[in-house]
Curated annotation (Swiss-Prot):
Localization (cell): Cytoplasm
Post-translational changes noted in the entry: Methylated by PrmC. Methylation increases the termination efficiency of RF1.
Gene Ontology MF terms in the entry: translation release factor activity, codon specific
Positions bearing N5-methylglutamine: 232
Designated name of the protein: Peptide chain release factor 1
PANTHER family membership: LD18447P
Compositionally biased intervals (Basic and acidic residues): 289-305
Keywords from the named record: Cytoplasm, Methylation, Protein biosynthesis
Pfam families per UniProt: PCRF, RF-1
UniProt region (Disordered), positions on chain: 282-309
Amino acid sequence: MLDRLEGVEQRFLEVESLLSDPKIVGDQKVYQKYVREHADLSKVVEAYREYKQVLEGLEESKELLKDPDPDIKDLAKEEIDRLDKEQVRLEDELKILLLPKDPNDDKNVILEIRAGTGGDEAGLFAADLFRMYSRYAETRGWKVETLSEHLTGVGGIKEIAAMITGQGVYSAFKFESGTHRVQRVPVTEAQGRIHTSACTVAVLPEAEEVDIQIDPSEIRVDVYRSQGAGGQHVNTTDSAVRLTHLPTGVVVTCQDEKSQHKNKAKAMKVLRARLLDHAVQEQNASISAERKSQVGSGDRSERIRTYNYPQGRVTDHRIGLTLYKLESIMAGQISEIVDALTTHYNAEALQEGGL
């Protein structure tokens, strides 16, 4: 591990030097690439330098144990105890920092929520989930932009797609893909019986044009008039756009904007992300079940979480986490869940890597 850390520190110094090179500064695209690399490396280097100081401190304190003065010996023992704990903490931190980084972690995401079983109640729960994620994004300083939405007649959401932009968005949202189940008494239920409904969530990293090539001849473009929740036309021009990727059958619609051009641009963003996701899912399917992370599999059919309103309980089934904080979680305070999932995933990765 120490050899790897020395290599990281050397690369950090190289990048630091490159950032002061006038040629690099003059090319903003290249400059920004090195700025991002510098930021990533700095986390490892800071921890490594602190670790080296702790090792030096331990050596000095062990030397003081040879001192004839008993008071100095006692102080040295106390310092060794403290530094031993620091050494363990920093070694654990460095192991995680040295894990291979998910190349998508810093990407923006396209968040898709679809109402599943449960009729109108599933649509209302889909709207609740979207509010929860939107509020969480706001607390992190991220921007949420609706790309397309199909509303139900009772204030729910049949299907919604939104772009969430900011630093590290995918790293926080990537474990949210799957089936989310709700248990509660619907507002329409006169007998007070608890119903179970479900929604599926898909989190797709934003795909740049370089990530996936799409042949324009393989896309069928249909235009039509935008419709409201009840099916009525809300626009007098054919501004809504439906894109069909013929080889895969993936269909994307967008009708939120009044401009056909803007709707097509938004639909292309979603299509590109879905096609990249389609390729990744196919690749994951070829990986043996033993090697695929339970937390990070992103299986859409996997029931990942239950929100039980009568008990005020939220349970994440993948890691056995139960929190009796449903109200604050639905208000967007999901950091505790995100952190627990990340910790679990890191522990899995460390075990797999034999660290």
